[in-house]
Amino acid sequence: MRVLLWGTYDTGKPRARILCKGMRAAGIEVEEIHARVWEGVEDKSQVTGLVGRMRLLARWAFAYPRLTWRLARAPKPDLLLIGYPGVLDAFVATFVGRLRKIPVAWDVFISLYDTIVEDRKMIRPNGIAARLLHGLERRALRRVDIAFMDTQAHARRIERLFDLPPRSCGAVWVGIE
């Protein structure tokens, strides 16, 4: 089996490294196409101010054309895997994945909406920003073929939060390095 880990996933956190190591240990061939959008950003919820947000937006704007081109030209994998955080990656990956008939899986790991709105209360739950974030994440979850979190409890919570079909979200434990 060949898996292509694709996108702007955060290499500063161990999650992607652990998944790759586990897949390789299981005999799965793993290739990577990655853009370092999150380099130097430890806590994504702390990207504040116009300059910080514009810098991140510019990184994305420059990353996606190259990522998309490389994905379109890469040898066809059996599975296209999007790493955490991946909300925007899901839209691009599923577009190309559908054209190339490649199933897309997303390691959601942590819901952005749940973290920013419900847990940290950084924006009002009924505000327009919260509604936009909820809608964006819900649409991303519905586009991918497979979504998974770090635990079954989180998977069930995401299903309820985003009105997904029961048992539609799986779980893969984080593990240790």
Where are these regions (language model features)?
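A short, charged, and often flexible helix/loop element on the N-terminal side
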Residues: 37-70, 121-128
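Membrane-proximal helix-turn-helix segments that form the acceptor-binding/catalytic region
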Residues: 68-69, 95-99, 127-147
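Short beta-strand scaffold positions
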Residues: 82, 149-150
